[in-house]
Amino acid sequence: MSDNRPTYDTSSSDEEPSNHFHIQLPQRQLNLQEIRKQNHKKHEKPTIAKQTASNLAKAKKITTGSNHKFGNSINNNNNNANKHLGSSSAGTNRRSLISPTSSTHVSSDDDDDDDDNAAFYGDKLNDNKKLNVFADTKNNLSHFQFNADGIKPKSLHGQGDDSSDDDGNNLDEVEDETHSDFAVLNQNHPPQQYYETDSSDEDEEDDDEVPQTVHKTYSNASSGRSSRLSRKKSMSETTDTRAPIPPTGRRSTNSNHSRESSGRRSTSSGNINSGGGLKGILRKMSLVDSTPVDSTNQDISHSDTFLGRVLNFGTNQGLSGGGLAPGASRVIREEDEGEWNLDEERRVGFAAHENDRDAFEMQPLNYEDLSEEAKQLIQQHVPGAGASNLDHSQQSSAAPSTEITPSQSPNQHLLNEKSNNNENNQQSTTVESSSSTSSPGEDEELARRRASEERKKAENPFYTPNPDLFLRGTNADNQELHQAPNDFLHDMDGDYIAPPKQVQAGVLSSLLRLYQNPQEQKSASSLSRVSTGTSGTALSSFDDSYDSDDYKDSKSSSNVDLQHKLKSGIKGGSKAMFNKAANKLKHHSHTRTNTVETQGSSNSEEFSNDKDEFSNGYDDDNKMNANLPSFQNARPKMPKKKTTEPVQKLKKLRHKQRAERLRITVHIADILQRQRFIMNMCRALMLFGAPTHRLEEYMVMTSRVLEIDGQFIYFPGCMLVSFGDAATRTSEVHLVRCAQGINLSKLADTHKIYKAVIHDLIGVEDASKKLDDLLKSKSRYPPWLCVLFYGLGSLAVTPFAFEGGWLDLPISFGVGLCVGYLQFYVSSISNLYSSVFEVSAAIVVAFIARGIGSIKGGDLFCFSAIAQGSLAIILPGYIILCGSLELQSRNLVAGAVRMFYAVIYSLFLGFGITLGAALYGWIDHNATSANSCASGHAIDEKWRILFVPMFALCLGLINQARWSQVPIMIVIAGIGYIGSFFAGKHFSTVTEFTACIGAFIVGVLGNLYSRIWKGMAVSAMLPAIFVQVPSGIASKSSLISGLNTADQITNKSSSNNGGTVTNDASSLSFGATMVEVSIGISVGLFAAALIIYPFGKKRTGLFAL
């Protein structure tokens, strides 16, 4: 060993490009205090002090070594390495080439390294020469990380036996690295954990040197240290000019000075399985270590393994992109070419050009591309599966099952799956709320579900094909009545139900099935009377499928005996006695059979199974305990023999027949209940004043939901209902007749029940019960309160419609009470009087009004205002509304009947007024004959609008409306009156145009209320139409036009012919006025429908419930 101190000449690395020693970049100062504490904790043995002293002496000699021998040492070292370059394998384990005694040989390079690695830091070393050495040569060696701040101890992967293989030159590296200049290090250099020492390169180099350096002098070790030092300085000089690199493994770190290292180093990175404790470090995060690692004392969070990077994921030392790309290869440098054929791993992050660094870098996952590829694969292998949706416990999605894009929310999927199920259950029925648009995949899935349900119904004997589809051919009519599915207004109402392909079988066909069962004609005795030979043959053939050939004869004979006994039991005994005897015979038969089987041949399958199951062979015990309760025979050893086959057949046949009868009976009861519900629904809608133009549609939708073959046709006052039976080509016709009335609260309740049924929210039984309770329930307001409302309504309508004065209001209130009493008390008592109620009421009103109006010559009260105001509530406003809606929906029969009835009704009222005025004229010859109020008698126009809300409120309460329904009625009625009032100022002589403008405003508001707030437009529009009718009539005062006729009657005109002509003209004048008003209201409602539903939504039926 030389005493000369070496000078650290960096020219050796430039002159020797084949130098194969590696060194790490230091980045931290030595944290001596921490290292001393750790070392003292781990090594508390007496031998440590001796080893420390010897190693400190060795370190002193190293630092005072000679300088002139470095050149020769380097040359010798290099020559030795080059000689054995080809002979030594890169993958050879270093320990297999080292002598067992080499760890104590001073002149060996490996001995020096091992001894130096077993040493501690001395207390008297200089600051630039402090060493970090661990002292257990047979145990695991510590590993250090260098950076600008300090050095942290790092435990190696390998332990125990691999201690001699890990970093044999650790002492030399530590000594040289402590003399490095840290000022030249780049601040952007990758952190310390990516420059941890990987012993794969040193080990492979040492493997080549082992045959020459095992017995070398220490000068070779010193020359190795100097060469590594020169290489390290050259690396530090090139650090400033190097671009920042991503954090990678040890292989990437050495690539910057790859042109100064040996060509063999390019092969060392490919040999992952070579020896060394640190070969488990992942290179560029994606290389996997294949050598077993003992990580007992390893700090995973600070290691360079995959787990360490995962634990440090949040820092700049964690996982990053890059790594060895799939399909990449490592190519050894061709020295003849003079340039590097860099492998892909090295080219990713350390290429010379910026554009080449990402050639094989792993990119983030593109989920859209993955989704498309998955769809293509699924469609290629499983056609049609790409459009299906998976059913999840909360699923619901508009996306197909192959969609894997993370942006697709499972909740939305779940919300969309639920909407699909609703559409499936309701057969394209939409709920009140807006529904999302379904994708083509959902449509296909929905179509498949419908097809499966239709197939199940087709196989069910209680379903028959819908005659509307194959027999009557009403598809075209359905398309005419209902809008096409692709219309954007299709889902607004939610009442449309597609006609089902299968409907419930009719009652008659079910009865025929019930009473024409051919098996019913056979008695029990005829089924049990079979010959012995036949039964024996049948039973023996049955036994052949279960019994073996060894004991088939004995079993068949016993079965024949059992059959004889059963037959006698069937003939002679009762059913209870027969069952008891059959069970007893069955028990004895099984006992005898088991005894024979136990004593019989042991090669049979039954005996072997019995022996294997119980594995004791207690034959005698089985015989003795045959009559005792035991669980050994609870499990049958073979299928039970049908020893009582005739009886079993008889029982099964009876059970099957009974079950079939029960099914048919339940089916008939269900059909009758559904038909009864449909008729009750029809009766309720007619009684409570549903819009008559939609009654047929309500019934059709209800029958479709209930799967009943029903046909309906409506005439005013009656509904023809036909329930068909396609199997027998018969139909059952019902006629539902009832007096049509108005009850807005019960109409709303009926509408709710109807909605619940068509959306399958409640069953038919519950709906029938609720409907029956609703039909039996009393009215919301008692009759005496309705009479009061009549009086208030008459009081309110007099000022704004007929120009009544303040003094006319109490008179109108009193006369209105009389009209209310006649309607709610007298008319309800006698059906005969209800037929002449309008005429009688008009007579009473005209008589009282003319008598009061004649006071003081007609200057105090206005006869026309009192008479018309008192009769305004019974004017045919609702009849005109229903008639115009029916004409608009092309229901010509009902519409024409109602409109003509409104005209006739008006003629009745006119005739009553004429008769009442004539009666008072006979009494008082000085009775007033004024057809209108005097000027200045009416209330100021600015106060008239205040009575409109009061009139609308009274109309609503008279028609049994809820208080919650009143506000919208008042709003629509008030706005409609304002429009008709100002229209009447300009078109005073044109009654039709005035009524048309008012009805148009009312229709627009009613349709908006129905479309936006999902309310009942008919109930909201009814008071407003009642306001429009009196206003139109009052414009010509045609209601009291019969007053002239009354005067002629009382004055007894001599011109009979002329009087007759005058009488005819006066009688028809009020009817003509009602026709004009009806036409104006109908045209206004048509125009409103055109504005709100510009594409003509026919299926909605204007002003839908």
From Swiss-Prot:
Residues 1-11, 85-106, 185-197, 390-413, 520-539, 592-606, 624-633 have a biased composition (Polar residues). It is a multi-pass membrane protein. Residues 67-82, 417-439 have a biased composition (Low complexity). InterPro entries: ThrE-like_N, ThrE/Ser_Exporter. Residues 1-22, 36-55, 65-123, 151-278, 385-473, 520-656 are annotated as: Disordered. GO terms for molecular function: transmembrane transporter activity. The chain crosses the membrane at residues 782-802, 809-829, 835-855, 860-880, 903-923, 938-958, 963-983, 986-1006, 1015-1035, 1075-1095. It is found in: Membrane. Its main location: membrane. GO terms for cellular component: membrane. This is Pheromone-regulated membrane protein 10. It comes from Candida albicans (strain WO-1).
